[in-house]
């Protein structure tokens, strides 16, 4: 599989350089869980999620906490319906903001089926069963898996994240180009991700 086959729309705004942020395993897991919750569709438990996230920020490095705080400020000033509308407009109506990671590596090609099989094999390897209707490469699902696994299983998930780091960078750049509040969430996530390691 090659990134050259992807059909995403490039952006003109490159992502800023990552700050050097030292994080413990616990703070990285917290970052993954927070990002998973905030990048998922804002359902009925949204207000409770925002409250829980706010109470967790003290566990994170200041740089990551600051990014999440900016998103919380934005979301706190809006009703859940307004956040839902913004979410749909951002992630469901703009292909360049796709939350399905294999899309960035393969586009809508036959190769994507192979890529999705690799992700499904990862879930099977760590004994994890999805409890929603999303595809297995849905970023919030993978982030939750990264937060909840340990040892060799966690290393497998981190390798998967690293292999899709380029797609996450493209997503972040696209969100920045739209001045999307979710750019802050992905910015915080980037600080906790493993180094780039392309498999395709």
Q: For the regions a protein language model found, what residue spans apply to each?
A:
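Short, extreme N-terminal leader segments that mark the start of a protein/domain
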Residues: 1-55
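Short amphipathic alpha-helical segments and their helix-coil junctions
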Residues: 8-20, 114-128, 167-173
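Contiguous, well-ordered alpha-helical segments that form the cores/surfaces of helical PPI scaffolds
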Residues: 33-37, 103, 137-147
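A glycine-rich, hydrophobic loop/mini-helix early in the fold
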Residues: 65-125, 129, 133
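Phosphate-end processing signature that detects enzymes handling 5′-triphosphorylated RNA
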Residues: 122-135, 144-149, 153-156, 180
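Short secondary-structure subsegments characteristic of cysteine-rich extracellular domains
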Residues: 152-175
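Eukaryote-biased recognition of C-terminal alpha-helical segments
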Residues: 185-196
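Conserved small/polar residues in nucleotide/adenosyl-binding loops
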Residues: 200
